[in-house]
Design a protein with these regions (language model features):
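Class II aminoacyl-tRNA synthetase catalytic cores and aaRS-like
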Residues: 13-244
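N-terminal amphipathic/basic-hydrophobic helices that include classical n-h-c signal peptides
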Residues: 1-19
Length: 244
């Protein structure tokens, strides 16, 4: 069963978010072929990034004053193409930044290729000088761009995200893509355990790995979870107490 309160919502979720509609897959395949023709490959081995988005935003005033050309790379999170101009937001591991494509700077052919082939979820590299929009948003005026990876399945949009709790747990990768709150929790946990490990390591403590599955259950009165190892034809127990 698919999530949603109404059958129509379930069907829409199945077709769009999970990418199970054949016409969507075929359209993406056509766009992939166009990108391959234009760039030689839609999945290059390297990118020429000079700044993370957070770094470009932090150093914005200096970059603007010097007229420095920067290159950022990341996943397209939003896209607004309007004929001879277009805006998009690129997100990397540090944050998100807006890019601007125009006929004057980017070139009409490059804009048309971007509009015809790039979708939310794709990875791109954008190069240009920074400027401030009329709405005071720090933006890159794109002089050149290229694809770094074509997403062959649609992802949940930035506005709606992935709201269904069951699907968020089942498809954790989509949850991390769509919901910054979930991603923030994972990052905080990672920093916490890194800090604990560093603190103890600097004081001479040794970290050891203990078995996850055991032949003999431990943990005093606690009832262990049991599983069967088919290849060994043996029962194993999930560890309860790490210290035992």
């Amino acid at each position: 069963p698919f999530p949603g309160e109404k059958p129509k919502i379930r069907l829409l979720y199945r077709e769009i978010v999970l990418g199970m509609r054949q016409d969507i897959v075929e359209t993406k395949q056509e766009k992939l072929e166009k990108l391959t023709t234009a760039f030689g490959t839609a999945y290059p081995e390297q990118c020429g990034r000079t700044h993370m988005t957070a770094q470009a935003i932090k150093c914005f005033d200096a970059l603007l004053a010097d007229g420095t050309v920067v290159t950022v790379a990341g996943r397209v999170k939003s896209l607004r193409m309007m004929g001879k101009i277009g805006f998009a937001h690129i997100e990397d591991g540090s944050g998100k930044m807006q890019i601007f494509l125009s006929e004057q700077t980017t070139g009409l052919d490059a804009i048309k290729l971007f509009a015809d082939t790039i979708e939310i979820g794709d990875f791109v590299e954008a190069t240009g000088k920074v400027f401030l929009t009329k709405k005071d948003e720090k933006t890159i005026d794109v002089a050149a761009w290229r694809v770094l990876g074509k997403s062959m399945r649609p992802i949940p949009t930035e506005h709606f995200g992935l709201q269904d709790e069951e699907e968020r747990l089942r498809r954790r990768y989509l949850d991390l893509l769509s919901n910054p709150e979930t991603r923030d929790i994972f990052m905080k946990k990672n920093r916490f355990w890194q800090t604990v490990r560093t603190f103890l390591s600097e004081r001479g403590y040794l970290e050891v790995q203990t078995p996850v599955l055991e032949h003999i259950p431990g943990g005093a009165e606690a009832e262990p979870f049991i599983t069967h190892h088919n290849a060994l034809d043996q029962d194993f127990y999930l560890r309860i107490s790490l210290e035992l």
